[in-house]
């Protein structure tokens, strides 16, 4: 049987930077926007970026994307089960 090839998804030019927020950062985010965690957009636990990060359901992911006008902008996703 052939060996499985490993690929780091974050090395791809089209994949933005992702990171898992700490519990303190998560609480700050919810207070800043005056929202409940259930109001965050969702991302499935099977998403390749989520799998690569090792995130689990309930974690909040911060995604940093390049913007031609703003430099960078951030958006957040709640990891949910499939």
From Swiss-Prot:
It holds the Pfam family RNA_pol_Rpb5_C. The keyword Glycosyltransferase does not apply. It catalyses: RNA(n) + a ribonucleoside 5'-triphosphate = RNA(n+1) + diphosphate. One of its GO terms (biological process) is DNA-templated transcription. Its EC number is 2.7.7.6. Its main location: cytoplasm. It is found in: Cytoplasm. InterPro entries: Arch_Rpo5/euc_Rpb5, RNA_pol_subH/Rpb5_C, RNA_pol_subH/Rpb5_CS, RPB5-like_sf. Keywords: Cytoplasm, DNA-directed RNA polymerase, Nucleotidyltransferase, Transcription, Transferase. It is an enzyme of class 2 (transferase). The keyword Transferase applies. GO terms for molecular function: DNA binding; DNA-directed RNA polymerase activity. GO terms for cellular component: cytoplasm; DNA-directed RNA polymerase complex. It comes from the Archaea. NCBIfam families: PRK09570.1 (NF007129). DNA-dependent RNA polymerase (RNAP) catalyzes the transcription of DNA into RNA using the four ribonucleoside triphosphates as substrates. Belongs to the archaeal Rpo5/eukaryotic RPB5 RNA polymerase subunit family. Part of the RNA polymerase complex. This is DNA-directed RNA polymerase subunit Rpo5. It comes from Thermococcus kodakarensis (strain ATCC BAA-918 / JCM 12380 / KOD1).
């Amino acid at each position: 049987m052939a060996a499985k090839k490993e690929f780091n998804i974050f090395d791809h030019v089209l994949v933005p930077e992702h990171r898992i927020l700490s519990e303190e950062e998560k609480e700050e985010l919810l207070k800043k926007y005056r929202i409940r965690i259930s109001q965050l957009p969702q991302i499935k636990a099977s998403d390749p970026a989520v799998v690569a990060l090792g995130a689990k359901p309930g974690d909040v992911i911060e995604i940093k994307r390049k913007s031609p006008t703003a430099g960078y902008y951030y958006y957040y996703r709640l990891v949910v089960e499939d």
